[in-house]
Amino acid sequence: MLPLNKLILIVILFFNYTYLVSAEDLISIKSGGKAIHWTSEKYPFITKNIIDDIEETYWVSSGNTLPHVLTFSLPSNKRFEFLSFIAKNNNKPETWAKHIRISSADPFPHMGGWEVIADLYLSQTGEEKIIAIDPKRGRYFRLEIFSTQNEMAKEASFSQFKVMDLLNN
């Protein structure tokens, strides 16, 4: 039998996970998100694949001159408190993004108003990484890829990026 405190923790984690899974992805194409700038892409593995909510699609760079910078926009300034990243895709694992940074801006990303939200290293498995942050507002998001799982990779790849807010449900 589980101690009461562990049982309570399991129940809380289950409900939070269930609620997060049902949270709307604010940056997805279905929600009006757009890919607005990128340093490179290799057709058909284009930048918008990262926000299309289809795990089988992904982005691949044309070459591996780092950093790769991918910029996305929401239809309007929105509140968010969770970010999700998936590097794993059908491309070679050594190409999967390793060191990334995500920044947000509103209203003028071209005027240097970027605020770094997260600077992190993704695991070699490429599995989904969800991070919770203090609630913020933003309209533009910049994903920078500084390294791949193997520094000798000839290209970089990334699967999915999500921006979520539990209060919007």
Segments the model singles out, each with a brief description of its role:
Residues G112-D134:
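Extracellular carbohydrate recognition and processing domains
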Residues M1-I8:
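Bacterial N-terminal signal peptides that target proteins for export
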Residues V21-P75, K88-T95, P135, E151, ...:
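Disordered, acidic Ser/Thr/Pro-rich linker "stalks" and the adjacent N-terminal cap
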Residues I8-N16:
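Bacterial N-terminal signal peptides
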Residues E144-M152:
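Short beta-strand-plus-loop segments that form exposed binding edges in beta-rich domains
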Residues D134-I145:
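Noncatalytic modules at the cell exterior or secretory-pathway interfaces
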Residues R79-N91, L143:
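A short beta-strand element within beta-rich, extracytoplasmic domains
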Residues P93-F108:
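Short, surface-exposed beta-strand/strand-loop-strand elements in extracellular ectodomains
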